[in-house]
């Protein structure tokens, strides 16, 4: 699938005070290590908290819907997974990965909204200004947008920094099959929110 807009963004769309309040709220929760179908520190090293807060969904949904339409993707989505609050401190990272895959959630999943569906749209919200940390770049790879389901990227040739995400309150929306990573943080702390919108498998 070749896209005209591999990602869509809204600069400083979330007010600073809301970003600050979210950081304050979720850093008070007990976090756990982020996983990739099981703990694997070679792929991922970050701390996460998951939330079903209705206010988060209400905040995120309009950006997802607008990006899905304005970017011309028009993906069939009908449910959003639990929102993830992520914290990256020094030496933490998330290596190359895709959020989506060809394998749908099982039909017996405890959440009815997940059953038989796959991740189609990923949304990332920057809660920290880039001046507060070093490293921690959010990068995408456009070398092969059709590489859905592969386990790793080899001979990466088309990496791009998503500079917009170094601005606090910026929202970036992209198809879940886009390869992306967060480079190691070398100083400071990077906070973000991530959500995934799901729908029936590709036809």
Please tell me what each predicted stretch does.
Residues 1-173, 177-203:
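Fe(II)/2-oxoglutarate oxygenase catalytic core
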């Amino acid at each position: 699938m070749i896209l005209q807009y591999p990602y869509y963004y809204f600069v400083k769309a979330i007010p600073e005070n809301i970003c600050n309040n979210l950081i304050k709220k979720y850093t008070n929760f007990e976090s756990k290590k982020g996983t990739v179908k099981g703990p694997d520190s070679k792929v991922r090293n970050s701390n996460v908290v998951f939330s079903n807060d209705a206010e988060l969904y209400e905040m995120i949904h309009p950006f997802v819907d607008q990006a899905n339409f304005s970017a011309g993707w028009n993906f069939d989505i009908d449910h959003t997974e639990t929102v993830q609050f992520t914290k990256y401190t020094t030496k933490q990272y998330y290596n190359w990965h895709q959020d989506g895959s060809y394998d749908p959630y099982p039909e017996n999943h405890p959440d009815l909204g997940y059953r038989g569906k796959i991740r189609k749209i990923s949304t990332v919200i920057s809660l920290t200004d880039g001046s507060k940390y070093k490293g921690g770049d959010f990068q995408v790879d456009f070398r092969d947008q059709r590489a859905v389901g592969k386990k790793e990227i080899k001979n990466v040739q088309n990496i791009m920094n998503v500079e917009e995400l170094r601005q606090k309150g910026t929202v970036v929306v992209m198809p879940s099959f886009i390869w992306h990573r967060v480079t190691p943080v070398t100083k400071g702390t990077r906070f973000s929110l991530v959500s995934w919108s799901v729908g029936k498998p590709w036809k």
